[in-house]
Amino acid sequence: MMDVLMYLFETYIHSDVELNVEQEKLEDELLKAGFHQEAVYKALDWLEDLARLQDTDEHARVATGTSTSMRIYTQQEIDGINTVCRGFLLFLEQIKVLTSETREMVIEQVMALETDELSLDDLKWVVLMVLFNVPGQESAYTQMEELLYTSDVGLTH
């Protein structure tokens, strides 16, 4: 599913191509591009869920946390998001790319991927897609885009 999402993002969203394609035509195009039908459906559902997140106040209550608040992950989140990725999310909060609200959106979208092994690169793409879909996050999106295309993100030990 991640391959389909990245393809859609790079082809339509990131390249400023107008996405006025009917879902059926888009599905056909993705199938012709070689993606499996199940992955296509899951990716389109994932994007619909992401769009729905920006239209709700579901995560607004999270934004009231203070800058000294620490996110405690559930066991399911720990199982789905490895230590490196959780550390990267914390790093993004510390450098103000993510707010507590956008972090929660990212975590929700990552968990919706239903992947066995989330890579750091996949996480970066999810963060970029979330920030792209949240109004007022243009600066954070630009910062994240720079982090995505650079291999050394300053995570030294």
UniProtKB/Swiss-Prot annotation:
Pfam families in the record: DUF494
Superkingdom of origin organism: Bacteria
InterPro entries: Smg
Protein family according to the UniProt entry: Belongs to the Smg family.
NCBIfam families (alphabetical): PRK03430.1
Protein name (database record): Protein Smg homolog
